[in-house]
Amino acid sequence: MSAATVSNSPSKWLVLPHYAFAAVSFVVLCLLLVFSTDAFGGHYFHPKLLTLTHVAALGWATMIIFGSVYQLLPVVLEVRLYSEKLGTAAFALLSTGTVLLTISFWNFWVGTIMHIAACLLFIAFVLFATNVVQTARQVKKWGIEADFMVTSVVWLVATGLVGVLMVFNFQYPFLPQDHVHYLKLHAHIGMAGWFLLLIVGVGSKLIPMFLLAHPEDNRSLHWSYYLINGGLVLFAADHLFLHTGLYALYAAMVVSGIACFLYFLKQAKGMGKRPDLDLGMKQTFVALTLLILPIVLVFVVTLQLGLPQRLLSALYLVYGLSIFFGFVSALILGQTFKTLPFIVWMHSYEDYVGRFKTPMPKDLYSVTLLRWQNIAYLVGLVGLLAGVLLAEQNIILLGAVLLSVASVLYAGNVFKVLLHKVKDLKPFGYEKAAKGTN
């Protein structure tokens, strides 16, 4: 990473609280899952399932993405972050809104508290989007990565707007269709528009960098951008206005866009100069492999296959879980220990490099905890998905407990890095000087 990029980095007090809040949210999410096994036997529009979804989407995934973007945006775009004050305000609003919305959904309070939570979250999204767009405007050489990142925040604001309208519609019905109709729109533009586009934009820059690869041909990324956005725009227009029901076609466009991104990563991996992958990168490729399940299921749930209603409801649940607990969570679990240790190391040891013997970023966390975290996570995920599909609460509970173990190991490792202190640094030549005096 260049010196210019390091100098563009924002204050650690903007970035690190996002990681702390996200780690706690992941533990809360998995513990709530333990107490929600009874909610997986029916429709996905259930207070406990809505709670789990929003803790996963907001407190866990969006929170850590906000913090990561503040740190990585200067890396990807090679400019300074537009405003740290906007970032701090967005963090305060996102964290407060997430807590209030979680309480509201768990108890299904559809009144004032839920309204306030939705408004706080929407304002947080607008502030974050403003920060990203204004930062991107400073770019001298615009690339496809900037297209992905700027477009993703547009979809984030759109997702938040639909969410606000739905929240107020609970108490003051004014939308022409039922809640489930808009929930599908809200969920899909959030998952594919916000999460997927941002992951592709950042991943197309960072994953080759971690692999020590420098692919110059990014035509597949351009195809990815237009296919994903084209499918989303057509889906939203059809869902709201046209009602042709060609959802499988739009899904195929988005999936084709994902395939183009994966092809780009395949090229990068082939060019990579790093022969051995660490646990973080292995987990990242596990996350990409986990994409296969929701890709298959999106066609199963959109095509009229005449499946029994109980099975179809279970497949809808597995589809959603495979995205948030599967792909997104696995990616975060893998990338956290590629990014967070470097951020803490940079702010702790930047002034000592070259003069003192300093630890490496990988020395700041426990590889043993990370290894057991990954094992507990994968076994727990398989148990959770199998239990939902088979409608077996005991298997769901086993999966939830293992995921809770993984979340505690993850949080412990995160706070080990966050609480790292500089101590007992020895200058270069110290050992030789010490031997010379003996």
What residue spans do the PLM features occupy?
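Hydrophobic alpha-helical transmembrane segments of multi-pass integral membrane proteins
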Residues: 1-438
